[in-house]
C-alpha cells in the first residue's frame, strides 16, 4: 500500500502533509512554499496554471483566473450566496445544465469540482515529488458545516484528480487531531476556524487518544474573501468620490484592488497603519489616475466589524448543543489565516473568557490533522480514535410535507436509530420514503438526499400498518436508510453517502421532474428507446443491403427498401408506437437478408475446412543462442 496523504483543500490556500514515521510533515511545493494558492488560470496559449504562477498573472488576466471556487462547490446557480459572489468576482459564473453554479473561461465551462481537482492534482504532484513514489489515496478536509452535496462535490474533485478519497473529515476535527496528538492531558477544547471562505466552530472532548466531537456549527459563506471585498468596495467608493470614476466596471482595476486589499489586510495584523499605492489604476481624458491611500487598523476593523460579529452566534449555538458554558472550555484553538487578525482574537477572548491558544500554525494545522487521520487509516498511527458527528439532522418527509427528524444534528457517528410510522390513507399498499438533511421544519426547505418505495403493504385502515424506518450511519458518514413493514417483514432500503453518493442537484432534478411529469417521462423514455433501436436497425440493414443485397430476390430487396423508407419516415416524429410497428415490419422483411448472409458464411467456412486438409507439414530445428553468436 502506497502512502496516504492528507490535504487541506482551502478556499484561498491549500496544503498537503504526510506521516513521516510517527511525525506529520507539511510538504513544500515546487516553488518552495508550504501552502499553495487555490487559484487556477488559463493563459492565452491555452496553458493551465495552478497555484503561485496563476496568482502572479491574475492582474493581467482577471477573467480567466479562477479563485475562491470552494464557495461555489455543491451550490446551485440560483443560490442567494452565488448571486452575491457574481457581483464580486471578475470571472464569469455560469449556470450548468443541471442548475449548478459553474465557472466559465475562454468560452468553456468548468464545474467547481473540476477547478478544485486542478488544485488537488498540484497537491498530489507535490507529494509525489517529495516521496519519490506514486500517490493515489488521500484524506481530504471540508468545513464541518458542509452539506451532503458539498461533501460529494469535494469527493468528486478528488476522483477527477486521480485520488481515491479514503475519508472526508471536518476541518476543525483535523485541527483538533493535530493539536491534541501529543497532549497527555484530557480536556474540552473549542476549535474556532475562520478561513478564506468558510467559518466553523467545533467543541471536542480529548483524552487518552480519543477525540470526540460534541457539537459543530458554522457558516459556509463567511471568510477572508468577504473581508477582502469589504476593503475593495471601500477603496472603490473612496476613489469614485475623489475622481468620479467607478473602478468596479474595470475588471483589471478590480483585480489590482483585490490584490492590494489582501496585502493591506495581512499587513494590518502586525502594524497599525498601511499605505495602499496603485499607480496608473485607470485613466480618463485628463490623463492617468493613481490610487494612494493610508489605511489604519481601526478603520479596517470598523469596515469588517459585522463580519467578525457574525462568528459569535455559531459559537454560542455550538456551546448550547454541547451542553457547556464558555467557562467549561479548557482551550480555544485558532485555525485559519483570518484568526491572525487582532480583532478576531479579541472577540474570541471576550466570548470564551480566555486567551486563545496560538501554538499551532493556523495555515498548516488542518493538513497536519488530515495526515494524522491518513496515518490512522494506514495503521501507522495507533491508539487514536476519532468520533465525529453528523453536522445536520437527518429525517424523512411525513404527512403535510413536515420534516420528521430521526437522527438529530451533532449525533456521534457511527449510529443507528429507528422510528415507526403508518399510512395516511385507507388500503394504502405502498409508501414513498423521502430522505432529507437540514434543520428546517418543512421537508421542502431542507436538502433531499434520495427516495425509495416500500411496496406490498396489506390493505388496512389508515394508521394501522406499522412501518419501521431505520437510519444507520457508519464512521465514514455512509447512510443506509431502510423501511420495513412489521406485518409482512417486507423491507426496502437505499444507500446514501453523507460524503458521497448522488449529488443533490441530480436527485433534486430527478425528483421534481418525476413528480411533475411522471407519465410524460415514461412516454419520452419509451420514444427514445424505440428511436435508438430503430436507428440501429436502419443502419445495420442498409449496410447489409449494400454488401449482400445481390444474394436475395429483387422482390425481397424492394420489400426491405420500402420498410427502411417507412421506418425513416416514422423516425421524423415522436410516436413510439408507430416507430415500434415499423421497426417490427423491417425486422421481418430483413430476415431473408440474414439467411443469405449466414448461408454465405457457412459456404466460406466449408471452403476453409477443405483448404486445411491440404496443409503441408514442415519440420523446424531449434538453434541454440550460443551457436548463433559463434
From Swiss-Prot:
Residues 516-558 are annotated as: Disordered. The keyword ATP-binding applies. Residues 516-529, 540-558 have a biased composition (Basic and acidic residues). Keywords: ATP-binding, Chaperone, Nucleotide-binding, Phosphoprotein, Stress response. NCBIfam families: PRK00290.1 (NF001413), PRK05183.1 (NF003520), prok_dnaK (TIGR02350). Acts as a chaperone. This is Chaperone protein DnaK. It comes from Nitrobacter winogradskyi (strain ATCC 25391 / DSM 10237 / CIP 104748 / NCIMB 11846 / Nb-255).
Amino acid at each position: 500500500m502506497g502512502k496516504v496523504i492528507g490535504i487541506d483543500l482551502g478556499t484561498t490556500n491549500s496544503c498537503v502533509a504526510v506521516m513521516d514515521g510517527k511525525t506529520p510533515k507539511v510538504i513544500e511545493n515546487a516553488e518552495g512554499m508550504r501552502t499553495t494558492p487555490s487559484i487556477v488560470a488559463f493563459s492565452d496559449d491555452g496553458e493551465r496554471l495552478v497555484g503561485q504562477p496563476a496568482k502572479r498573472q491574475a492582474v493581467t488576466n482577471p477573467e480567466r483566473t479562477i479563485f475562491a471556487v470552494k464557495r461555489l462547490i455543491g451550490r446551485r446557480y440560483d443560490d442567494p450566496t452565488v448571486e452575491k459572489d457574481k457581483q464580486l468576482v471578475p470571472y464569469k459564473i455560469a449556470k450548468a445544465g443541471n442548475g449548478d453554479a459553474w465557472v466559465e473561461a475562454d468560452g468553456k465551462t468548468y464545474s467547481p469540482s473540476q477547478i478544485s481537482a486542478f488544485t488537488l492534482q498540484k497537491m498530489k504532484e507535490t507529494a509525489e515529488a517529495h516521496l519519490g513514489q506514486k500517490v493515489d489515496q488521500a484524506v481530504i478536509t471540508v468545513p464541518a458545516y458542509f452539506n451532503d452535496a458539498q461533501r460529494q462535490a469535494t469527493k468528486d474533485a478528488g476522483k477527477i484528480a486521480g485520488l481515491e478519497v479514503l475519508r472526508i473529515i471536518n476541518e476543525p476535527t483535523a485541527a483538533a487531531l493535530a493539536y491534541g496528538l501529543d497532549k497527555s492531558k484530557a480536556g474540552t477544547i473549542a476549535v474556532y476556524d475562520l478561513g478564506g471562505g468558510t467559518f466553523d466552530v467545533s467543541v471536542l472532548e480529548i483524552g487518552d487518544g480519543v477525540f470526540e466531537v460534541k457539537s459543530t456549527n458554522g457558516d459556509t459563506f463567511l471568510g477572508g474573501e468577504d473581508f477582502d471585498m469589504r476593503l475593495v468596495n471601500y477603496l472603490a467608493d473612496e476613489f469614485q468620490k475623489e475622481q468620479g470614476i467607478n473602478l468596479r466596471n474595470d475588471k483589471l482595476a478590480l483585480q489590482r484592488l483585490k490584490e492590494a486589499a489582501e496585502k493591506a489586510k495581512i499587513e494590518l495584523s502586525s502594524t497599525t497603519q498601511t499605505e495602499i499605492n496603485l499607480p496608473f489604476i485607470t485613466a480618463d481624458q485628463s490623463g492617468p489616475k493613481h490610487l494612494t491611500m493610508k489605511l489604519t487598523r481601526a478603520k479596517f476593523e470598523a469596515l469588517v466589524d459585522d463580519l467578525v460579529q457574525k462568528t459569535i452566534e455559531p459559537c454560542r449555538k455550538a456551546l448550547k448543543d454541547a451542553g457547556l458554558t464558555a467557562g467549561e472550555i479548557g482551550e480555544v484553538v485558532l485555525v485559519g489565516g483570518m484568526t491572525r487578525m487582532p480583532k478576531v482574537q479579541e472577540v474570541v477572548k471576550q466570548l470564551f473568557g480566555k486567551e486563545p491558544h496560538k501554538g499551532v500554525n493556523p495555515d498548516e494545522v488542518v493538513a497536519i490533522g488530515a495526515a494524522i487521520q491518513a496515518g490512522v487509516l494506514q495503521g501507522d498511527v495507533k491508539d487514536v480514535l476519532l468520533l465525529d458527528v453528523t453536522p445536520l439532522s437527518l429525517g424523512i418527509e411525513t404527512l403535510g410535507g413536515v420534516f420528521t427528524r430521526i437522527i438529530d444534528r451533532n449525533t456521534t457517528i457511527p449510529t443507528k436509530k429507528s422510528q415507526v410510522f403508518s399510512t395516511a390513507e385507507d388500503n394504502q399498499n405502498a409508501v414513498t420514503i423521502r430522505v432529507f438533511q437540514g434543520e428546517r421544519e418543512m421537508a421542502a426547505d431542507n436538502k433531499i438526499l434520495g427516495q425509495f418505495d416500500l411496496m406490498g403493504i396489506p390493505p388496512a385502515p389508515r394508521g394501522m400498518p406499522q412501518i419501521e424506518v431505520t437510519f444507520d450511519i457508519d464512521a465514514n458518514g455512509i447512510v443506509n436508510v431502510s423501511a420495513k413493514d412489521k406485518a409482512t417483514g417486507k423491507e426496502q432500503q437505499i444507500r446514501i453517502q453523507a460524503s458521497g453518493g448522488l449529488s443533490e442537484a441530480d436527485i433534486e432534478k430527478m425528483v421534481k421532474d418525476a413528480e411533475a411529469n411522471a407519465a410524460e417521462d415514461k412516454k419520452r423514455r419509451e420514444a427514445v428507446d424505440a428511436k435508438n433501436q430503430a436507428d440501429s436497425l436502419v443502419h445495420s440493414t442498409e449496410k447489409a443491403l449494400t454488401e449482400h443485397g445481390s444474394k436475395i430476390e429483387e422482390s425481397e430487396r424492394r420489400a426491405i427498401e420500402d420498410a427502411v423508407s417507412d421506418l425513416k419516415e416514422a423516425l421524423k416524429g415522436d410516436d413510439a408506437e408507430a416507430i415500434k410497428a415499423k421497426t417490427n415490419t423491417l425486422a421481418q422483411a430483413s430476415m431473408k437478408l440474414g439467411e443469405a448472409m449466414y448461408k454465405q458464411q457457412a459456404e466460406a467456412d466449408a471452403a476453409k475446412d477443405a483448404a486445411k486438409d491440404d496443409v503441408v507439414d514442415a519440420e523446424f530445428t531449434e538453434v541454440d543462442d550460443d551457436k548463433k553468436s559463434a
